[in-house]
Amino acid sequence: MGKSVVILGAQWGDEGKGKIVDLLTDRVKYVVRYQGGHNAGHTLIINGEKTVLRLIPSGMLHPNVTCLIGNGVVVSPEALMKEMGELESRGIKVRERLLISEACPLILPYHVAMDHAREAALGKKAIGTTGRGIGPAYEDKVARRGLRVGDLFNKEAFAEKLKNILEYYNFQLVNYYKVEPVDYQKTLDDVMAIADVITGMVADITTILDTARKNGEHILFEGAQGTMLDIDHGTYPYVTSSNTTAGGVATGSGFGPRNLDYVLGIIKAYCTRVGGGPFTTELFDDVGAEIARKGNEFGAVTGRPRRCGWFDAVAIRRAIQLNSISGFCMTKLDVLDGFDEVKICVAYKMPNGEIVEYAPLAAKDWEGVEPIYETLPGWKENTFRITDVNKLPQNCINYIKRIEEVTGVPIDILSTGPDRVETMILRDPFAA
């Protein structure tokens, strides 16, 4: 009997989802992206070779897997072709194994221009977007003015729609933001040059998934970003523009929610965050700097340094509620090697003195929040590349067990290094 498994970030993104998707892809027929765009940065290291995938599902490195991009994903034709080219230069037959929903909104140059113009205008109050046009493309979708993949089939109608929407954007860019307009003809020519390649990969994603389920095939849904960046449930307004939680699978792919069997939440052994927004356990001392150094905490897409802090069980409890998480995969356990002590945030003290065990929603409600920590003995032994849980230091095992206790969710997979083989699967999501 086939299983449908969701892999998603349970923190603020950058948890190591790409490696785990790649690891579990050996078991599946389909890997599906259902939200986000090329603002994702899924880093895979296989046999020492590094690959960063931003838009194409991580399953593309497995020749027997078909990769699907669902309607909830915003697609940059330029970014897609660039990524396809990189993979095809390595002999990977992308066009034979990548299928795209015709309902995917397109990201075009005016979205990118608007993204940059807005962030520049906000100055120090900027959200900290990746500047790739993701937000403006989702805005167009909701406003029902956006161009979609399906529009590429009718080139004349596309050209007319593009002209109208570009007038709307250029008016704002020139008159309000005082920046250069986006050139209509160049935008049209660039898209038309690759339109046939993209339309050649269009398919009915919902029917493919439903048929696969009925045929007993394993399906893996690959989330991007993280739970606390969800447009509705994250630390608004410091969030991304899509639903990063498990509910996004149904809306972003057309796969019925009752058909999901297991939700795997990816967590780091500590916490990180990129860009602005609240981060209760953030460390500003030498410990935080050491975690960042050992964890190589720089964004795969932006290259920006990540903010680092202790494990936040309060935020994780909210993620468990939102996603109905079945089990965790803990990554970067080895980064905590060598510390005299490690800490887990088990509650927040609110400005009014109230003690809470679940994170607030809006960013403004995090102001003045203080972390309440449990301190555990650290471990000096090296856990890097250990693949037998019985060989982990006892204090490390105690740390893992305590996180399971304070969250109420089992840790089913442990990662002790960037390569796919540096992993311990304690309970297989496809066998659970």
Swiss-Prot record:
Its cofactor is Mg(2+). InterPro entries: Adenylosuccin_syn_GTP-bd, Adenylosuccin_syn_Lys_AS, Adenylosuccinate_synth_dom1, Adenylosuccinate_synth_dom2, Adenylosuccinate_synth_dom3, Adenylosuccinate_synthetase, P-loop_NTPase. The keyword DNA damage does not apply. It is an enzyme of class 6 (ligase). IMP binds at D14, E15, G16, K17, N39, A40, G41, H42, T130, R144, Q225, T240, R304. Pfam families: Adenylsucc_synt. GTP binds at residues 13-19, 41-43, 306, 332-334, 415-417. The keyword Metal-binding applies. Substrate binds at A300, V301, T302, G303, R304, P305, R306. GO terms for cellular component: cytoplasm. One of its GO terms (biological process) is IMP metabolic process. Keywords: Cytoplasm, GTP-binding, Ligase, Magnesium, Metal-binding, Nucleotide-binding, Purine biosynthesis. It comes from the Bacteria. Pathway: Purine metabolism; AMP biosynthesis via de novo pathway; AMP from IMP: step 1/2. One of its GO terms (molecular function) is GTP binding. Binds 1 Mg(2+) ion per subunit. The active site is at D14 (proton acceptor), H42 (proton donor). It is found in: Cytoplasm. Its EC number is 6.3.4.4. Mg(2+) binds at D14, G41. Belongs to the adenylosuccinate synthetase family. Plays an important role in the de novo pathway of purine nucleotide biosynthesis. Catalyzes the first committed step in the biosynthesis of AMP from IMP. Homodimer. This is Adenylosuccinate synthetase. It comes from Haemophilus influenzae (strain 86-028NP). The lineage of its organism: Bacteria, Pseudomonadati, Pseudomonadota, Gammaproteobacteria, Pasteurellales. The gene is purA.
